[in-house]
Regions:
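An N-terminal assembly and electron-transfer interface module characteristic of large anaerobic redox
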Residues: 1-443, 447, 454
Length: 454
C-alpha cells in the first residue's frame, strides 16, 4: 500500500491537463495516477471526502488519466457512512476485476494525459456564434448588445429550466456544486438543440483564477462537449489574469468600456426596480419603466462609439424617472437581503425566483451590485500582496482597477445620493476596513505591524 506522495515524484504529468492544476495535493494525485498508468502492477484507489465542487474536478481528472490508458479507477467516498462495509465491497470488486484482466491477458495502450485545446481563431470570429451562459438577466440584457457591437456574435442563453438542470446532471459529475450543473446544463441544452451549427459554434465562460471551482467551469464544459461528441467546439476563457489566450477574442478598450457601462446600468436597474416595485400604485408600472430604459441602454451600448457624457445622462435619467414613480409612500415592508454564491444570487432559476417570491410574500428584496464582486476581486489582489507574498505589481494594477470602476459608477452614485427613495452602494475600502473587526486576523500587515489588521 503506497500513498500518493511516495510515488508522485517518479513521473511528471504531461500538461496541459483538462483542469486548472493549482492545488499541491491534487497535483500529487495527478502525478501518482500518471505513474500508475504506466505500470501493470500498480493501481489507484482515491479516497474522497466531499467538500465542494473541487472534489468533482479532481476525481474526474484522476479518472481520465487512468481510464484513458485502460486502467481501472476506484474512488471511495469515506464520509458517506460510519462503517466501512461499502468500502470493503468496492475494494473486493476492484481486486476481482484485476484478476479477471490478468487471466484474459488484456493489452492496453498508455495514452498521453495532455489535452490539446481548440483555440478560437481570428477566422472563427467572423462567422461563429458564441454561446454565453446566463447568470443575471437584468445585467446581461444590456451586456449582450455591447459584445455584439464589437463584432462578436454572442448569444446569451435563456435562464435555465428544469430540462437544462437535468442536462447538467447528465453531463457533469454529480458531486459538482449546483451552479456548475446550471451553467453546463444551459450550454449543453443549446448545443444539442439543433438550433446551432456545431461546426460554427463556440462557448465563452468567465475564468476567475481563484481556488474555487469557478476557475474550472471551463474544464467541466470541455469534458461535457467531448462526451457529447463535440470536442471540436472551442471554449473561450474570459479572464483578466492571462490564464488562456485566444487570437479571435480580445478585450479591447471599447469592449471593456461598453461592458462596464452595461454592468453599471444593470446595477442601477436592480437597485431602483427592486426598491420601487413592491410599493407601486399601478401594478406593472415599475416593469414597464424598466423596459423603457432598457431599450435606451441597449441602443446606447450598441453604438460604434459611446459617449461618457451620454452615459452620465442615462444614469441620471433612470434614477430620476424611477424616483418619481407613484408608490404608496406610507407603506413599510421588511427588507430582505439576498446574498451567497454569485450565480445563485443573481440567476432567477438558480435561486427558485427568490426575488419574486419575496415580493409576493410582502417583502422588499435587496441584492448587492454585481460590480461589487469585481471590486472584491481587485481588493483581494491587494490583500494577497500584503499578506500572502503576491507581487506588488498585481496590487498596483488592482488599485487602478478599483479607481477606474469607482469612477465609472460615480455618476450613478451621485444621482442616487440626490434621490428620495434610493440608497447608494458601499465603498469597497470602507467595507474591507469594517470587516477587520469581524474576520480573523492574518499575519501582520505592512500597514499595521502590531495588530495584524489591514
Amino acid at each position: 500500500m503506497l500513498t500518493e506522495d511516495s510515488i508522485s515524484h517518479l513521473h511528471g504529468v504531461e500538461r496541459p491537463l483538462f483542469v486548472m492544476d493549482q492545488w499541491m495535493y491534487h497535483s500529487r494525485m495527478y502525478a501518482a495516477a500518471s505513474y500508475a498508468r504506466t505500470r501493470d502492477d500498480l493501481d489507484v484507489i482515491q479516497l474522497n471526502s466531499f467538500g465542494c465542487g473541487l472534489d468533482a474536478v479532481t476525481t474526474d481528472e484522476v479518472s481520465d488519466i487512468l481510464t484513458n490508458s485502460g486502467k481501472i479507477y476506484t474512488c471511495l467516498k469515506i464520509d458517506e457512512v460510519n462503517n466501512l462495509g461499502a468500502a470493503r465491497i468496492r475494494i473486493r470488486s476492484l481486486i476481482s476485476a484485476l484478476r479477471v484482466r490478468e487471466r484474459k491477458q488484456e493489452c492496453r495502450t498508455v495514452e498521453s494525459t495532455a489535452y490539446e485545446r481548440v483555440v478560437f481563431t481570428e477566422e472563427m470570429r467572423k462567422d461563429y456564434t458564441i454561446l454565453c451562459p446566463q447568470m443575471s438577466p437584468i445585467h446581461f440584457d444590456v451586456i449582450e448588445p455591447a459584445f455584439r457591437s464589437c463584432g462578436y456574435h454572442i448569444d446569451v442563453l435563456p435562464d435555465s429550466d428544469r430540462a437544462a438542470i437535468d442536462m447538467g446532471l447528465k453531463y457533469v459529475n454529480n458531486d459538482a456544486c449546483y451552479p456548475s450543473l446550471v451553467v453546463v446544463g444551459q450550454i449543453m441544452t443549446a448545443v444539442l438543440s439543433g438550433k446551432y451549427d456545431p461546426d460554427k459554434l463556440a462557448v465563452i465562460i468567465t475564468q476567475t483564477g481563484g481556488g474555487c471551482r469557478a476557475t474550472n467551469y471551463i474544464s467541466f464544459i470541455r469534458r461535457a462537449l467531448a462526451k457529447a461528441g463535440h470536442a471540436n467546439i472551442p471554449v473561450v476563457s474570459l479572464n483578466l489574469t492571462g490564464l488562456e489566450s485566444n487570437p479571435g477574442f480580445k478585450i479591447t478598450p471599447g469592449l471593456a468600456f461598453k461592458g462596464l457601462y452595461g454592468l453599471v446600468f444593470g446595477d442601477i436597474f436592480m437597485r431602483v426596480l427592486y426598491r420601487m416595485r413592491p410599493y407601486e400604485k399601478e401594478p406593472g408600472s415599475a416593469d414597464r419603466l424598466h423596459q423603457k430604459w432598457l431599450k435606451i441602454c441597449q441602443d446606447f451600448v450598441s453604438q460604434k462609439h459611446v459617449s461618457h457624457r451620454r452615459f452620465v445622462q442615462i444614469c441620471k435619467g433612470i434614477i430620476e424617472d424611477f424616483d418619481k414613480l407613484p408608490i404608496y409612500e406610507d407603506m413599510k415592508k421588511p427588507r430582505v437581503g439576498v446574498v451567497g454564491e454569485i450565480l445563485v444570487k443573481y440567476s432567477p432559476s438558480a435561486n427558485n425566483h427568490l426575488v419574486e417570491l419575496l415580493e409576493s410574500e410582502g417583502a422588499e428584496a435587496v441584492v448587492p451590485e454585481l460590480m461589487d464582486f469585481l471590486l472584491y476581486c481587485f481588493k483581494n489582489s491587494e490583500f494577497k500582496a500584503d499578506h500572502l507574498g503576491k507581487k506588488r505589481s498585481s496590487a498596483r494594477t488592482a488599485r487602478l482597477g478599483i479607481i477606474a470602476m469607482e469612477w465609472l459608477r460615480k455618476p450613478a452614485v451621485k444621482a442616487l445620493k440626490k434621490s428620495v427613495h434610493f440608497g447608494t452602494p458601499g465603498n469597497i475600502d470602507e467595507m474591507a476596513e469594517q470587516a477587520t473587526d469581524c474576520l480573523l486576523y492574518t499575519s501582520p500587515s505592512p500597514r499595521d505591524s502590531t495588530s495584524g489588521r489591514i
